[in-house]
Amino acid sequence: QMLDVADFDENSLERLVQELNQMFVVNINTIDKTKEILSRYGIKFIIVPKFDKTPIDGFSFWQGKNPTIVLTLRLNKIDNYAFALLHEIYHVYMHLFNNREQKYIAIEGAEINKCEEEANKFAKCSLIGKDLWNTFLKQHSMISPHAMQMKIKQFAHQHNINEAIVLGFYQ
């Protein structure tokens, strides 16, 4: 169903990321919840079937008064979903807002330009802070895979991050 989409507010990025991170932790009805949250922030959200020949995870563009984010669920796992979503959100706020003719498409294996690199970095840091992650890895560099699994569980719980997202980072 089409939701009413609010006006887009270019100063709401931090709030939006916090709200999405809460949603990733719970990870129930995630697609509907994403649509609902994004519409409140003035962003249209669409899921399309993955493309056969092209490894596209998502794309974003401006449509009328609002930005639109499209995800393909090519890799149907919460860590990929969260990353792809935050990647496109970064494009919306940092690139599309000032240049509405532009379109961004995330294709796996494509040559990475500065905009894509920035969006990747933002998505990663929004899910798990860089310093937090590096500290975790340093502390647990010498432990067995089984022990690491326990540490990942603890880390996820302690920092209120979805366990599968932490695991995705680790792999």
Predicted regions and their residues:
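Active-site hotspot residues in diverse enzymes, especially metal/ion-binding acidic/histidine motifs
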Residues: 1-171
